[in-house]
Amino acid sequence: MVYEEVSLKNLKIKNDYKSIELSEISKSDMHKRIKTFGWVDCCRTGKSITFFDLTCQFKSIKCVYEKKIDLTKCTSLTIYGTIQENKSKKENAEFEVLVEKLEIFNDAIAPSFPLNKESSFDTMMKYGHLALRNKQRGFFLKARSSLLKIIRDIFYEGNFIEITPPTIVQTQVEGGSTLFKLKYYDKDAYLTQSSQLYLETVAPVAYRAYCIASSYRAEKSNTTRHLSEYTHVEAELANIEFEDLINNIEHLVTESIKRFYDLLGDEIKDLYPEIKLQNVPKRPFKRIRYVDAIKFLNDEGVKKDDDTDFVVGDDIPDSREKIICERFGKGEPVLMTHFLVEHKPFYMKLDSSNETCTESFDLLYPGIGEIVGGSMRLDNYNKLIDGFKREGLNPEDYDWYLDMARFGPCSHGGYGLGFERLLMALMRYTNIEFATLYPRNTRRCHP
């Protein structure tokens, strides 16, 4: 250990210094002698004095050491000192620690930190493991963890059962072109695109079920809102109708946003004073059918990338989804509903009034585009077989899933929420890669 010259014995460490977690130190500890551990966040020195911030568990404390010592960012320290009133007129901290002694863990001063405020996005991602040591990036961990807990709490309050489905599968849900294929012993298998089918098997027993798990899409999409591996919040509800499904997702989204900002809003404002937090959306969300959305874009003079009009049958890209939120939704989320059968997978229930459409929806969020997709599910055996044939799938591969339409079927539906997209919206991130720990996409699979 590197010690300041006053011995531990002389300081009577055991008797005089209260060992306390840095995150628990408060103004109520004023004038107390404390021992705590943390990492140097920043440091500046004078002729015979050192000022540094020590950080741990998303909290920092100001420290004053009446000796000159060169400390670098990320150096691990145990300090012994006294809590006193902050004497700096430039700092707004309520208190500071007058350090009487410090220990440098393993006698190791950290090397020069490779990141700063001017670092590019790619450099930040390259050093993602160190970027976490910066306050804003490190706070992402707390934000993500908090939002996950909030979502779980809401499901728990709604009597949902959480399941942990497999992620190695032999069936597809969202189309074969986006599957990651692998060898599973002597058979072909895939990384899951969605856990929906497994949730459907649970719904007749649990009535309400959800999972929060990784899903994988082999899409070569080089955008700010796509990941190859993402956190998928999926739910399935038995004995419901389309309106019930819509109400459930509206409740989940609005309540998640409210609780998230109630919990972390002040901290976010302190870290990002330049951004404006999202408002909690008003319910019910505005709705527009897919065919009407096509007409709306044309009426607004919004063209496709090739400068032609949209026609029924076209996919609506995320850039135009944002326009729908801005102009039709007036800056609020919009539910786009009743997509064409050929747009959606085999399992979606047909609209009873128009069987060219499905009882489906995408939730479009301002500034992001789609963050949730959902539908009522087919519950008729013969119509499921028709769906498999339409998409060129072998029903024998889905024999277990077809049993759901034979053994006690009911009207049921569900949805999948892209967790990182929601977090991206709430934290006002400019890139979805900020919403996950170590992004996986066409550019990154390291570390």
Curated annotation (Swiss-Prot):
Enzyme class: ligase
EC number: 6.1.1.22
Gene3D superfamilies: Bira Bifunctional Protein, Domain 2, Nucleic acid-binding proteins
Catalytic function, reaction form: tRNA(Asn) + L-asparagine + ATP = L-asparaginyl-tRNA(Asn) + AMP + diphosphate + H(+)
UniProt-annotated location(s): Cytoplasm
Pfam families given in the database record: tRNA-synt_2
Keywords, sorted A to Z: Aminoacyl-tRNA synthetase, ATP-binding, Cytoplasm, Ligase, Nucleotide-binding, Protein biosynthesis
Keyword check for Nucleus: no
Biological processes annotated in GO: asparaginyl-tRNA aminoacylation
Entry keyword Protein biosynthesis: yes
Top-level taxonomic group: Eukaryota
One MF term in the entry's GO annotations: ATP binding
InterPro entries listed in its UniProt record: Aa-tRNA-synt_II, aa-tRNA-synth_II, aa-tRNA-synth_II/BPL/LPL, Asn-tRNA-ligase, Asp/Asn-tRNA-synth_IIb, NA-bd_OB-fold
Primary subcellular site in the record, as a coarse category: cytoplasm
A GO-annotated cellular component: cytoplasm
Record-stated family: Belongs to the class-II aminoacyl-tRNA synthetase family.
Protein name (database record): Probable asparagine--tRNA ligase, cytoplasmic
Species of origin: Vairimorpha ceranae (strain BRL01)
